[in-house]
Amino acid sequence: MSDTKKNSPVSSLLQHERLRVPGMYLSFMARHFVHDNILMSAGSLAFQTLLSLVPLMAVSLSILRVFPVFGSLKQNIGDFLFQNFAPAQGALMKTYLWEFIDKTSSLSTVGGIFLIVIALFLISTIDHTLNGIWEVQAPRKVMQGFTLYWTVLTLGPLLIGTSVVASSYVWYSVFAGGELLQQKVTVLSYLPLINTAIALFLLYMVVPNRKVRFRHALAGGVLAALLFELAKRWFAFYVANFATFEAIYGALSVVPMLFFWIYLEWVVVLTGAEFVFSLGYFNPEEPDEQQEFDPLQGVPEVLAVLSAVWQAQISGSFLTGKKLLTSEIIADRSKLGLIVEFLERNHFVHQTADGGLAVNVDLHSMTLYELYSQMPRELFSSEPGREEVADGEIFEQMRSGIRAALQNTMQTPLIELVNDSTQRDP
């Protein structure tokens, strides 16, 4: 009886329904993974990281040396970074990197500035790559970007140093020995995973120039940290059993080995970013396969945003871009960001001195066609299942008129167009 019930059509249908949404989500994420060229982006970042690793660590340690409390922790902080982010077979890499970093201390002022510029370029590339995943079209303003990059470059080392000091205090005061010794070993084994998850959570939460939900960034950080640990174990196994770097390159084998590891790291980081992006923008509702062609696709959303800015303006207040992105005007926050950027770029709205948005055109004289003709291509299309803004009777009448006009104009048989195109070919 139980076997019959388990294999019933209803049970099979429920099981299919449970698997349908995860399958659609993975398909959505895979499409964006391919579209964003994640593997190529990871290779580009790995190459730039390889060139910037020594300058970045040198600048970070120089910043820490400014504060006496961190001055004696150089080796501890280096060990912290290698323990959490380097593979198990990284002893040789660690030795070479420390040699390179020690040599940077003899550089002149110009050389030091050059190291800072290289480090900032790496942070800028990471910023542009992650914002590309979140489909941010407009770059950060120069001062805003510089402030963010400089904050990361200066506060990042301080946070790491503070973490090392705090963990050392807890380590030697709470887990001094005795019955807590076993707990000390257990905590030690989980620290790299926890530290990696926190670092990636902050990366996904802070860097994208979009609103990212806390739980999405946290889930992405945990997933990427787990993948990170798997990558470390696989890399250690691969190097120990299959890698031929040393046989081919000899003493230089550390360079391709380090590049390969950094490449794996960036694949994991960018995969986690795609996971977080997909959590925010995936909609499991399937589109209507028989949906009628809509010549005004995207226009109601643009007008909804313009209307929200206008209504706030005439009421005496101004909507900021941040408030718009956190509002429920459009469920698809990525498309909402594109609309705001389009309206600002084409001077339909402008930012006030207080950072609010104000309508910049005369809505009584400007026509819909003037708006429509300037809309970028990406606003005319949407991902399957993404919600649209409901519109009124005027739009329905306009759609019917456009469809009728298109139908009358496009009565030409396709063979005539094909022949005409063939005749024009050289």
UniProtKB/Swiss-Prot annotation:
Keyword Nucleus carried by entry: no
Membrane topology: Multi-pass membrane protein
Annotated keywords: Cell inner membrane, Cell membrane, Membrane, Transmembrane, Transmembrane helix
InterPro entries hit by this protein: UPF0761_bac, Virul_fac_BrkB
Primary subcellular site in the record, as a coarse category: membrane
GO cellular component: plasma membrane
Similarity annotation: Belongs to the UPF0761 family.
Protein name: UPF0761 membrane protein Cpar_1343
Entry's transmembrane regions: 50-70, 106-126, 146-166, 187-207, 217-237, 250-270
Locations listed in the record: Cell inner membrane
Keyword DNA damage attached: no
Pfam families cross-referenced by the UniProt entry: Virul_fac_BrkB (PF03631)
